[in-house]
Amino acid sequence: MASSSTAFYLKDAGFHIRNVPKEWNDWNLFHIFQVFGRVGYCRVAGQSNDMQLGFVNMLSAADAEEVRKNLHDGNLIGDNYSLKVSDHKNIGGALLPMASISVQKLLSSPPAKSGPVHLSSSWLPLNKDIEVEVVDYLPSSSAAKDVFALTILRINDAQSNEKYNAMHEKMNSYAQLVAFDSELQIGYDGVFRESPRSIKRVRRISATKLYLVDFGKIINYEKSKCFQIPKVFQTIPTRVSFCGLDGLTWSEQAIPSFDNIREVVQKWGAMENATLHAVTCGFAGAINMINLFCGNSVLAERLQRKGICEYLPRHQQPRFAYSRDSLLKHTNAGVTAHISNDADVVKDLLKKIDGVKSMLRELDL
């Protein structure tokens, strides 16, 4: 392969693009030309109008010739694009940009050193009925030993689907640019090359297993297919959510069987003829506390009938969780407290406050 400096000065291997879409960056242009061969340099230069200028230099004359074979009257046409391409073979090499980015240099440069990455877990909306699927369990240190936790995946949500699909499209483009071979620490996150053109975000959960944090599946760990996750893909939380069943108190005898119970619950979700639904009632630390049901079948009630736990529905519990929207609505309603100068009214108010304090002490709140 030619060196990056050779590629820069290689005669008759450069192209000038006059109408790069304004929303494109270097990598968009790179992926158009890498179909025809090895790209040495690729640069998009912003312009004040709706289009940008682009500069591409292929790594060999043969690679450049493949580009020329696909030009039609100076146009490179493909899915959803039509680029006006000037061939440096015809106009000379003087237009080669000195500020071009070396793709080969980017590919060969080691990633910036940083600490291990841990993606944030996905929060579910309060008091909202959503469609979900119970997926493979993602172990977490967030759950106490006596808390029965599940991992669920939100489904049939167009807005969420669009966000994650867009992220994975960018990740799959990134997969073409880096060499994968990194040691992931157990309990931390990275990306996994599933196929030559597809990567997925993962967490290493054991010496031999990875967890697909956006799909809810466990796969085998292969060091040669792993890479530290780029910072740009760390901002979106995992698509799976860590959940507990609200209102359940478990017997000591049931706790060692949590793994088996999780398997039964996952099969229950898969066997139901209708879609599972979840409503988040509140939060316990980093855990979404949910009611999980399918039609008239409520999971917590089914487990209670097995005699392995006690179930206290949310409306019977002493504490309540209110949604952020409800609190904002109340705050914005313009209701303000008026201070009274009447001594008797103030004394009565203080008595009520003392009564509330006593009640809270009795409830150990």
UniProtKB/Swiss-Prot annotation:
Required maternally for early embryonic cell divisions. May have a role in DNA replication. GO terms for molecular function: mRNA binding. This is Embryonic developmental protein tofu-6. The keyword Ribonucleoprotein does not apply. Gene3D superfamilies: 3.30.70.330. The keyword RNA-binding applies. Residues 13-90 form the RRM domain. Keywords: Cell cycle, Cell division, Developmental protein, RNA-binding. CDD domains: RRM_SF. The lineage of its organism: Eukaryota, Metazoa, Ecdysozoa, Nematoda, Chromadorea. One of its GO terms (cellular component) is nucleus. It comes from Caenorhabditis briggsae. GO terms for biological process: cell division; DNA replication; embryo development ending in birth or egg hatching; embryonic cleavage; mitotic sister chromatid separation; piRNA processing; positive regulation of cell division; positive regulation of chromosome segregation.
